[in-house]
């Protein structure tokens, strides 16, 4: 196989032996891939800072002589470092959550071009100091779940299809197992998530219809933002089959009001 040159986002790096790293990255054309970066721990000059988590890089890799082994990473050049994200622990945790989500969900060598573009766009927006980080996170989660075919049903009861507009006020049960909201007339949830208000659900629906520019113009209550975020993060964890480590860290930051 000839060498492949492509843009990628670093999803994970783990130590291998005394000097090497196994680097997992996400590309537009080939999806998630892993490669062996030889001597990456021994010499900083070998790859510089171009193997850091969620960096956008230009990489060159090719299969070695050993059949069935990992491809060898020969070059990694930094394209976008996202420095403003790295100077903010909360933003760093959010970017880490997105990387961990894609690492856990994506299949090897299965192209996901729209998700790749979503990740790049979300990192660029998060790197912008003027943009609300929580809105960027909510939009990422909404778009990711949609592209993964897992969009939550928020406009009507998943059992009787009664429109949200006819529910009145009060708490709303979100059922992870059924993938949407359940009206009071249909009973309890099988796998309940956070309890939401009608207003919080409507704000999520409004956000889902627009882009970041439109979201920036919306005046959203803090409580509704928090409830909507908690819903999407818990729904994501339900479908991943586990709570991502970076999400646990994020929750700890929030508990400490960081």
Swiss-Prot record:
Taxonomic lineage from the root: Bacteria, Pseudomonadati, Thermodesulfobacteriota, Desulfobacteria, Desulfobacterales
NCBIfam families: reco
InterPro entries: ARFGAP/RecO, DNA_rep/recomb_RecO_N, NA-bd_OB-fold, RecO, RecO_C
Function: Involved in DNA repair and RecF pathway recombination.
Single GO cellular component term: bacterial nucleoid
Keyword list, A-Z: DNA damage, DNA recombination, DNA repair
UniProt-recorded name of the protein: DNA repair protein RecO
Family classification: Belongs to the RecO family.
HAMAP family registered for this protein in UniProt: RecO
A biological process from GO: DNA recombination
Organism: Desulfatibacillum aliphaticivorans
């Amino acid at each position: 196989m000839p060498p492949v040159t492509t843009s990628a986002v670093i999803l994970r790096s783990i130590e291998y032996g005394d000097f090497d790293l196994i680097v997992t990255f996400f590309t537009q054309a080939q999806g998630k891939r892993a490669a062996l970066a030889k001597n990456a721990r021994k010499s900083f000059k070998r790859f510089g800072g171009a193997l850091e988590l969620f960096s956008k890089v230009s990489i060159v890799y090719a299969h070695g002589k050993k059949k069935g082994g990992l491809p060898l990473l020969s070059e990694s050049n930094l394209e976008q470092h996202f420095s403003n994200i790295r100077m903010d622990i909360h933003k760093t945790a959010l970017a880490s959550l997105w990387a961990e989500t894609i690492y856990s969900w994506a299949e090897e060598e299965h192209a996901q071009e729209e998700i790749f573009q979503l990740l790049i766009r979300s990192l660029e927006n998060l790197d912008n100091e003027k943009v609300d980080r929580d809105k960027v996170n909510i939009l990422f989660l909404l778009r990711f779940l949609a592209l993964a075919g897992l969009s939550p049903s928020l406009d009507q009861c998943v059992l009787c299809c009664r429109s949200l507009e006819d529910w009145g006020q009060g708490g709303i049960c979100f059922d992870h197992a059924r993938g949407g909201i359940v009206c009071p007339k249909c009973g309890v949830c099988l796998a309940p998530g956070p309890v939401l208000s009608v207003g919080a659900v409507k704000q999520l629906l409004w956000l889902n219809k627009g882009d970041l520019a439109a979201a920036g113009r919306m005046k959203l209550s803090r409580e509704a933002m928090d409830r909507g975020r908690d819903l999407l993060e818990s729904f994501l964890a339900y479908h991943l089959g586990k709570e991502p480590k970076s999400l646990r860290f994020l929750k700890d930051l929030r508990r400490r009001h960081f």
